[in-house]
Amino acid sequence: MKYSEGYLLDNRYQFERFIGSGTFGEVWVATDKATDIEVAIKVYISMDETGFQEFKKEFQISFELNHSNLLHANYLGVNAEDKRPYLVMPFCPNGSVSSQIGSMSEADLWRFIRDVASGLAYLHSKTPPIIHQDIKP
């Protein structure tokens, strides 16, 4: 199934716009019809079992994290229509990091670097350590 703007996922999440694609699938901004809150929906596109288990593990790890500089997955669902799993996460409306860096003051940039390092240090302190694998410059 190809998702598009306006798609209603599980009679709850109204897709508003496509953000991008990653290792496991597509990411969309959606409105949660139950709360009227914008969320990010990460839909697992490939249907192989190994990839699905990794996607599920990503949710489990994210759900258990507790750090102010890390996003927390709120829900793992399976689309009733096409059986594709999806994650519901907070939507960050300020755009990508790369779109923000150019307008940051030097002091804000150093705070940002400190916050990223703090989040990564938290991940690396877990047992076993969690390696992010998708950090972009």
Provide a role label for each language-model segment.
Residues 82-96:
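Conserved short submotifs of the Hanks-type protein kinase catalytic core
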Residues 96-105:
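AlphaC helix of the protein kinase catalytic domain
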Residues 45-64:
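AlphaC helix of the eukaryotic protein kinase fold
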Residues 16-23, 27:
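Protein kinase glycine-rich loop
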Residues 28-29, 36-45:
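Glycine-rich ATP phosphate-binding loop
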Residues 72-85:
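Short beta-strand micro-motifs within the conserved protein kinase catalytic domain, predominantly
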Residues 118-130:
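Protein kinase catalytic-loop region centered on the HRD/HxD motif
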